[in-house]
Amino acid sequence: MSLAQLTQQPVQTVQASSTVAEAARLMCMHSVGALVITDATEVTPLGIITDRDLVWMIAEGLDPHTATVDQFVRSRLHSVCVTESLSDVTKAMREHGVRRLPIVDPEGRLLGIVALDDILLLLGKELADVAAAITGELKQEHRLGAARAETGK
């Protein structure tokens, strides 16, 4: 499976100038736990704001109606290019300690987002497919062995 196929699309975004309250409304409206923060063009990813960021902000006493999401923009956004492998994505998540990464094209334009949960679901399905194939082969071998035993060969 390619990274493009695994990527959640359309990706939910919020402009950097939006308030945290608006980001929370968007998360609720789209049933997502994170939004990619973009510039005014909504093409260039600048950062990510998560539901955990919202909890932290409230715990710190910031006003969600005046605080803007650009406060969550780090100096360097970690993203991966759509041409990279799934292995590269999991390595980047591990190295940067993140659970979600924006997926960009070679020019840096936002294409989607991939979450660790998506990867785990894919790998679980792949393992189940392998287990089913092995089980099928073992059943076939057992049937052949039983048939040989009946015929005495």
Q: What is each stretch, according to the model?
A:
Residues 13-31, 38-39, 80-97, 104-105, ...:
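The conserved cystathionine-beta-synthase
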